Amino acid sequence: MNHRFILLAFFCIQIVFGQSFGKNKVQYRDFDWKFIKSPHFDVYYYANEFELAEFTANAAEEAYEQISIHLRWTLKKPVSVIVYNSHNDFQQTNVVDTYMSEGIGGVTELFKNRVVLPFDGSYKEFRHVIHHELVHAVINDMIYGGNIQGIISGRIRLNIPLW
């Protein structure tokens, strides 16, 4: 009986890992990136989306103000926020290796603590996603010192609570 259960569990796990197999990240075009700076963020954008980049920088600063108060933490260095004009362009990102399905509204990359966001046309939803992803970025800064490279090189000691 136990052997059947183990065999069934093994095949179920293989099915879960097989969902992303064969999904390639195709990059249809090259992006001409520009960026603007705010006190705590470097916002990268492309095409003629300066207004979207300004909105992103302002929304990020507003969100950071709330997050830093709630978590009692200030960022050690500016966080890069990469903004794509559409979800189709967002799916081409090479910041993370994972295929970005339609349901993903943004991602915070741990290695360099970068936030990657697609703009879907709704400023209200975009502001919400910016806030959500910046919570991840601030927590990464709290735990890993801004990037995981410091832990790998041994420069940062983890002081995780032992609850």
Q: Which stretches of residues belong to each language-model region?
A:
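Juxtacatalytic substrate-recognition/specificity segment
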Residues: 18-159
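Bacterial Sec-dependent N-terminal signal peptides
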Residues: 1-26
